[in-house]
Amino acid sequence: MITERQRQILNLIVSLYAKDHTPIGSKSLLDSIQASSATIRNDMKALERLGLIQKEHTSSGRIPSVSGYKYFVENVIQLEEFSQNDLFKVMKAFDGDFYRLSDLFKTAAKSLSELTGLTSFVLNAPQRDQQLVSFEMVMLDNHSVLSVITLGTGEVRTNQFILPKSMTEADLAVFSNLVKERLVGKKVIDIHYTLRTEIPQIVQRYFKVTSEVLQLFESIFDDLFKEHLTVAGHKNIFDYATDNLAELYKLFSDDERMLHEIREITNNDEMRAVKFDNDEKFMKNLTIISQKFVIPYRGFGTLTVVGPVEMDYQRTLSVLDLVAKVLTMKLSDYYRYLDGNHYEISK
């Protein structure tokens, strides 16, 4: 346990070091701490013994340690009001109407990346507990078909595809009835199971060429089973990482691995999570920060940034909080739009 003055000193060292990455000496703290230079030096020695700050080899000053950053984020930091400049930039980015959920997430990821200078990720809420409430298929012409899936949240998914050569319009009607009888009313997680157990056997009874029918099932429903990760700021790693660039770039391009990292640190009820001690050797000097945001009627999505341990946590957390609030506001508008019997067209 550290004293209140030591807490103030740690706060100042972290904040000052984030600005110019210069080791901090006791004289730099005199104007902000009501104590003598000797008292401040003693408190700095106490913080050093606790492993919260450390000596920089080329200077007599001190810099925050990984443990110091962790303590700062968990016990010291207090979120300040976001700056008017940041608020203007985020509101401008989200200005206008959004008709696709993916566009909202892309805007959020880009805003996070540009304002923090870090690599950012946006994760949608899991869809496994959503219910399929209706399914329709519409012939657009002799060859093109539009499938329309409606979920319990009011969200509508559409998928345009070319009718397989082996299928007639009569076959399409049978297909549609199968979906309505076997899948409508079920949760997404149960649909996933049914498609892999019951449906292949049923398809054999109704269709001569089963492979194309099963592929059609997969084409229409596969997107429901995926967690979608939106990424921005890949190139920012060149600004904050000097080692293992290839490994980092590979990680940030691998949705499954990043999903694992994000899920690992957000697997609790906390709205915000910070991971300092990463098992991956090439990420030992990096920090992962995730913050949940509300998705109306669906639960929580996650905003994540990855950056250097010595990042400006005060600003980064403030920007995360700002983007989360604006994104939730725009998501509310988006779902009101869907409630007006509109739906987005999937590419």
From Swiss-Prot:
A biological process from GO: negative regulation of DNA-templated transcription
Protein name: Heat-inducible transcription repressor HrcA
GO MF: DNA binding
Lineage, uppermost ranks: Bacteria, Bacillati, Bacillota, Bacilli, Lactobacillales
Transcription listed as a keyword: yes
Pfam families according to UniProt: HrcA, HrcA_DNA-bdg
Organism, scientific name: Lactococcus lactis subsp. cremoris (strain MG1363)
Function of the molecule: Negative regulator of class I heat shock genes (grpE-dnaK-dnaJ and groELS operons). Prevents heat-shock induction of these operons.
Keywords carried by this UniProt record: Repressor, Stress response, Transcription, Transcription regulation
Family: Belongs to the HrcA family.
Gene3D superfamilies the record matches: 3.30.450.40, Heat-inducible transcription repressor hrca homolog, domain 3, Winged helix-like DNA-binding domain superfamily/Winged helix DNA-binding domain
